[in-house]
Amino acid sequence: MNKQRRSQLSEIVGNLEVLKEGLEELKEEERECFENLPESLQESEKGQQYEENADDLETACDDLENLIESIQEVINR
């Protein structure tokens, strides 16, 4: 791979890392909303929705991290 394509991939990795940080912040906000609910409301539909949203955002963050690692492997070859 030439220097220009490596540079383009590095820029993409940087953009993905910014997106991942944004998702992590939103995940934490959802998790805090859930944890700040009284216990009786945590088991309500709304509470379960907060928890499910946080879990799905965590999965998305993990997927993005895997993508970033895969691209970095290509850059480092």
Roles of regions detected by a PLM:
Residues 1-77:
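Long, low-complexity or tandemly repetitive, helically biased scaffold regions used
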